[in-house]
């Protein structure tokens, strides 16, 4: 019965069955998810270029390097927080797993607040630093500031999906990302064409779709995965101990 429930929840036990098959089964959604994440930028590029013109397209393209640098760091940190969770889950250390999950969530909260404030305030100077053309500057600042204001949504998806993968479920984060990618395309079109928004519409569509994928991952974790694994976060836990911070930082 437990095995059936785990299959329904999407959890894969890599120690059961043929190793190569299980690894490929777990890794395929990761590869496909990486490809679909590119749809966010691709959808913005295509719809902005077709509907708003070359200057708007240039403004969005100018922000790519900053977007990649800042959000890439945030995503990497969130994925890193899932590593000790995976180790304790594999060791069947439920108490340690709960502590790492709570510590990781708290650090993600701090990370999202700090990066949101700093990057939003520094968006203009950073664009000047990379010599953004004057005719593109206003739209570029508007676009990247909205993206940076959406860092909490990025953190939510990447941490929640990292936790699900750490517990053996790589399929549902991919499913939720696929849904969010489709929603992003629809919102891009809605905001830019019928509603007449500019590059801010494209940025807002990206943030909202990322928020949707994060909420879906979090909902699945708390309603299915956490219950199945017998995890409870109601009892007080030791947060941010030196050992846990060191391992999370690693």
Please provide the spans of the model-predicted regions.
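Short alpha-helical transmembrane segments in multi-pass integral membrane proteins
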Residues: 1-27, 85-150, 194-250
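Interfacial helix-capping/hinge residues at the ends of transmembrane alpha-helices
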Residues: 45, 82-83, 123-124, 161, ...
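Alpha-helical transmembrane segments of multi-pass membrane transporters/permeases
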Residues: 95, 108, 163-189, 200, ...
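Small-residue-rich hydrophobic transmembrane alpha-helices
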Residues: 57-117, 154-173
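Residue-level signal for short hydrophobic patches within transmembrane helices
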Residues: 16, 20-39, 43, 66, ...
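Helix-terminus/linker motif at the lipid-water interface of multi-pass membrane proteins
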Residues: 35, 39-58, 127-134, 190-197, ...
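Small-residue hotspots at the loop-to-helix junctions and early N-terminal turns
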Residues: 52-65, 144, 203
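Generic alpha-helical transmembrane segments of integral inner-membrane proteins
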Residues: 31, 35, 39, 43, ...
